[in-house]
Amino acid sequence: MNSLQVLTKKVLIENKAFSNYHEDDVFILQQLELWWENGPIGFCKQCKMVTSGSMSCSDVDSYELDRALVKAVKKNQTDLIKLFVLWGANINYGIICAKMERTKVLCIQLGADPTFLEVGLYTMFVDLFKQQKVLLAIDIYYENIPILDSFDSHDFYALINFIYNRYILYLDEKEEMTRNTLVLKFWFKIAIEFNLIKPIRFLSKKFPHLDDWRLKMAVYLGNVDEIHHAYFQENIRLDPNHMMSLACMYPQNKLGIYYCFALGANINTALETLIRFINHEVDREITFFSNYGIWSNVHFCISLGANPYIKKIQETLLREEKNVIMKLFFKKGLLTSHSILHKKILEPGEVRKIISTYEYTETFHSFSSLRDNLR
């Protein structure tokens, strides 16, 4: 049962009773747990967002209700915990972050499953991933060493690898990452992959030391919106050829490859990088050529103007028996640049239009040429 004090706070906050306050009121509001970040606490019932002062629901610093609960639990703010649960927050998120025994007891009294810490950790991790709740996941796991340590080592890394290959997470890392850093990068990567603007901006602001890695991740995943934002609005710069080498490694990454090309990367160097990678996979006796995605990158680089008739590239293209169409195109001299890609455009929306048009026409362009040459 909620106290009269909690219910009173609920009514006052929902009716924005503290929208106009005097500086002398700040201390009192803080003592009454009616202060959030830099202003009086606010709550939007429609968006389920907790705000501060004049902050809007869409503000990068506004909190989803479950995130607000986690923060209140970490600070042992009893009335706010009760209030957020009253508004509909999931108390199981709270018990994971409770550091004091009395706070854990309160969470259980409010409906948390006392066995959740033993049986619910992996399920929650996967559920947060499915729902793309990046910021909530970071609030729960980042710097929550007891919880991270409670994961079985093998299962923890298997979980990360199951959802995502760890290769890109280790860019810029010279030694094995701590679980803490790995979790942070993992969820940051999810935000970039799905272009979750608010989480990206929030994490960029909070973790500026990851700026270069963020740009590399955006290139690798072909997120042209984030590449454009980092490159032109934040002035985060990397060598375009280095960026291109990352773009080429992600299957069917036309957006990333094109954007690096438009920034000035050498497209012949990109094709050579792909060929070296393909040959490396052959040496390791991995059946990599069945991977259409990487061969799609090869074809796209050629469409951008890369020269496929260099000896080393010829040998690779002719040796690959599984890529019959690519081999046939090569023998007939049909691997040429595509006219629609001649312009170098950097505005993300226009880039997507160009790639969309290219994808619509490339098959007809190639097979039409093949038909004419085989007559």
UniProtKB/Swiss-Prot annotation:
Any one biological process term the GO annotation gives: taxis
Function: Plays a role in virus cell tropism, and may be required for efficient virus replication in macrophages.
Family: Belongs to the asfivirus MGF 360 family.
Protein name: Protein MGF 360-6L
Species: African swine fever virus (isolate Tick/Malawi/Lil 20-1/1983)
